[in-house]
């Protein structure tokens, strides 16, 4: 499974690794440059991360906004929890099967996790982070035999991992990758997230083009993220499209090369994505009584575009975590502002209702431990491909007044 990452690390020469015609790609599109002689003991600090000052995260921490009590999930490469920047972070690998990440994928997963929960410079240093390994075959990752399923979705497929993260209690899911997968299992995983109040944040990619169907941001309800710099300007490498909702600083980010132990500079929507996810986590911590829909309303109403207008390049504008923790979301309607995106999107409101009413075929649902089939198809009973409780004819759509 997998495709070229949207990650470029320039050690001696540039190496553009962008989205190709395949299933998954890391969304970083990062350009990494050596930062000079470095040693394993050279821990990365807040002073090395321009976004830390840009978002005034020192002030957020001083006021106790650290993401405490919020559970975030990332679907990415392995996270190296031995990295000194991650010392003391609450990180649990919840991968449902054996995935062995290459060094490249491990670096990417570690970098994304660090933007969230690094002790010194993470946007949410006290959040609980659940990690799920995705296998990128192009990069030399391998998925074990225990990931494979004869009839149905493999355990390391994207819809399977999204549902698994929801099963495990994730409140926010951050996806620093793109995917050309447009199948029903992904649609129903997103429908579940929308109905159960789980926010999914996805990078737009780094091909500098309209990403169209190549990012999870195309789905209804998903917070698509593009990249800006610390002057608020959109970055040329950042992709765009009708799925973009917000924007955040994509670099420069100081990251660690796990092979050389040198620090490098990197850029990409892979870093912008966890900054938006982290901002939502800070708002969730500050406003625990707000609904998920109200937090999404808060995100778009505090975006930095003039009058919070939308465009396909930065959505409603750069994320503003300070404004999000200082603006009471209870003033906004409990309605999902992303239920129908510009130009139309799926799942549609009717499709979301199909999911909540339990009439979606269980063969299209991947590892959703909350799903009950309530439709009328008797063939679903006893079928080995149906692992879900089946209560024929009990859907509320058959019993409405």
Which residues does each predicted region cover?
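Solvent-exposed loop/turn segments at secondary-structure junctions
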Residues: 77-81, 97-99, 121, 135-139, ...
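C-terminal subdomain of the subtilisin-like protease fold in secreted/lumenal serine endopeptidases
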Residues: 236, 287-400
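Subtilisin-like serine protease catalytic core
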Residues: 61-72, 78-92, 100-152, 220, ...
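N-terminal domain-start motif of subtilase-like serine proteases
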Residues: 44-72, 95-101, 320
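Secretory targeting and sorting signals
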Residues: 1-40
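Extracellular S/T/G-rich loop segment that most often corresponds to the catalytic His/Ser-adjacent loop
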Residues: 214-285
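Substrate-binding/access-modulating region of protease and related hydrolase catalytic domains
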Residues: 138-217, 264-267, 271
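Structural recognition of the beta-strand scaffold that forms the well-ordered cores
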Residues: 71-75, 128-133, 166, 171-176, ...
């Amino acid at each position: 499974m997998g495709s070229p990452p949207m990650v470029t690390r320039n050690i001696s020469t540039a190496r553009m690794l962008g989205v190709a015609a395949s299933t998954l790609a890391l969304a970083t599109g990062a350009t990494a440059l050596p930062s000079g002689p470095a040693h394993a003991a050279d821990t990365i600090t807040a002073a090395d991360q321009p976004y830390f000052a840009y978002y005034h995260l020192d002030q957020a921490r001083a006021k106790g906004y650290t993401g405490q009590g919020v559970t975030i999930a990332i679907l990415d490469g392995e996270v190296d929890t031995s990295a000194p920047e991650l010392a003391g972070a609450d990180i649990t690998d919840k991968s449902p099967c054996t995935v062995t990440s290459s060094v490249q994928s491990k670096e990417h997963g570690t970098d994304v996790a660090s933007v969230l929960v690094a002790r010194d410079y993470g946007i949410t240093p006290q959040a609980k982070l659940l990690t799920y390994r995705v296998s990128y075959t192009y990069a030399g990752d391998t998925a074990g035999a225990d990931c494979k399923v004869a009839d149905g979705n493999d355990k390391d497929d994207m819809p399977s991992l999204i549902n698994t993260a929801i099963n495990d209690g994730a409140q926010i899911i951050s996806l620093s990758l793109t995917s050309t997968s447009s199948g029903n299992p992904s649609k129903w995983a997103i429908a579940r997230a929308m109905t159960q109040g789980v926010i999914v944040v996805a990078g737009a990619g780094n091909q500098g083009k309209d990403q169209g169907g190549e990012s999870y941001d195309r789905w209804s309800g998903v917070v698509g993220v593009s990249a800006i710099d610390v002057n608020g300007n959109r970055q040329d490498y950042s992709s765009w499209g009708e799925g973009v909702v917000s924007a955040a600083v994509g670099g420069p980010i100081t990251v660690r090369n796990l092979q050389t132990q040198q620090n490098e500079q990197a850029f990409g929507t892979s870093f912008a994505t966890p900054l938006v996810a982290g901002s939502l986590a800070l708002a969730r911590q500050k406003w625990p009584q707000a609904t998920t829909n109200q937090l999404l309303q808060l995100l778009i109403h505090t975006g930095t575009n003039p009058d919070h207008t939308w465009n396909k390049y930065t959505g409603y504008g750069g994320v503003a975590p300070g404004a999000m923790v200082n603006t009471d979301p209870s003033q906004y309607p409990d309605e999902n502002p992303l239920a129908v995106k510009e130009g139309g999107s799926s799942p549609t409101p009717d499709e979301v209702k199909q999911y909540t009413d339990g009439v979606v075929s269980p063969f299209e649902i991947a590892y959703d431990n909350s799903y009950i089939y309530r439709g009328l198809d008797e063939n679903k009973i006893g079928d080995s491909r149906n692992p879900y409780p089946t209560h024929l004819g009990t859907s509320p759509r058959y019993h409405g007044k």
